[in-house]
């Protein structure tokens, strides 16, 4: 595929350009914050972390919910399929989740640009990527490994 970077440092890059403007039907989502957390935050640090996660992922979550709802809407029998509807039914979403990585649990690490820390994150990312490939490599180009409807609605 073709690498994509929006140049933003304050939030996730938009998914829609990958969906609409790229030739690849496979879209890999790499999460740096968990989609959901168990329990309610109580300490100042827990609340601060959750606020940062929600702010960081709000646009991404809204965009992915849009994909889920648009796909469900396009499934209605009276809808005549155009380019968007065809694309909704041929895109294959995949996701690598970072939950459980202690280095990303705290909100203060999101802005840490210390070389050794970034190298550690790179190695952890490679490990997660290799683990994902070991489980799902055969799905690439064939079918989605992420159920967008179940995950985002």
Where does each model-flagged region fall?
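Non-catalytic peripheral regions of patatin-like phospholipases
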Residues: 2-4, 8-153
């Amino acid at each position: 595929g073709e690498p994509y970077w929006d140049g933003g440092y304050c939030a996730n890059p938009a998914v829609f350009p990958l969906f609409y403007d790229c030739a690849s039907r496979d879209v890999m989502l790499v999460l740096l914050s968990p989609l959901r957390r168990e329990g309610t935050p109580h300490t100042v640090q827990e609340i601060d972390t959750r606020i940062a996660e929600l702010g960081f992922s709000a646009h991404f979550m809204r965009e992915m919910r849009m994909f889920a709802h648009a796909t469900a809407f396009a499934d209605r029998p009276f809808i005549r399929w155009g380019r968007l509807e065809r694309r909704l039914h041929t895109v294959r979403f995949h996701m690598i989740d970072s939950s459980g990585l202690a280095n990303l649990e705290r909100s203060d690490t999101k802005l840490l640009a210390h070389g050794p820390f970034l190298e550690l994150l790179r190695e952890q990312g490679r490990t997660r990527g290799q683990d994902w490939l070991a489980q799902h490599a055969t799905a690439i180009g064939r079918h989605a490994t992420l159920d967008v409807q179940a995950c985002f609605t």
